[in-house]
Amino acid sequence: MSNIPSDLRYATTHEWVRPEGDGTFTVGISEHAQELLGDMVFVELPDVGATVSAGDDIAVAESVKAASDVYAPIGGEIVGVNEDLEDSPELVNSDPYGDGWLFRIKADDADEVEGLLDAEGYENSIEEE
């Protein structure tokens, strides 16, 4: 079973969201998602300053197996991206909840995060796949 930290919220599309306490949220893909994709070879990140809506496909994770869209789990403005992934996309595999984060978003409505799954709900959604 994949590692599913209880302090994060999750989208059914396998993105995780971590509040940073200043109205911004860090987003990445779950350990389960990176296990399905395999070894990352490239990550296409959104543009800083872009305004996105929940459910928009805004990034691409490319692995040796496949390319997979990454969706915005909440709406808002992209305020930062993980530039380390440009040279080291494998961070998504080795540390999906830490150094392998993808982007930061300033939420239009922070309450939108409450509509995402908690760890138990996400684990149940994986088991139903």
Curated annotation (Swiss-Prot):
Its cofactor is (R)-lipoate. Binds 1 lipoyl cofactor covalently. One of its GO terms (cellular component) is cytosol. The modification N6-lipoyllysine is found at residue 65. InterPro entries: 2-oxoA_DH_lipoyl-BS (IPR003016), Biotin_lipoyl (IPR000089), GCV_H (IPR002930), GCV_H/Fam206 (IPR033753), GCV_H_sub (IPR017453), Single_hybrid_motif (IPR011053). Residues 24-106 form the Lipoyl-binding domain. The glycine cleavage system is composed of four proteins: P, T, L and H. The glycine cleavage system catalyzes the degradation of glycine. The H protein shuttles the methylamine group of glycine from the P protein to the T protein. This is Glycine cleavage system H protein.
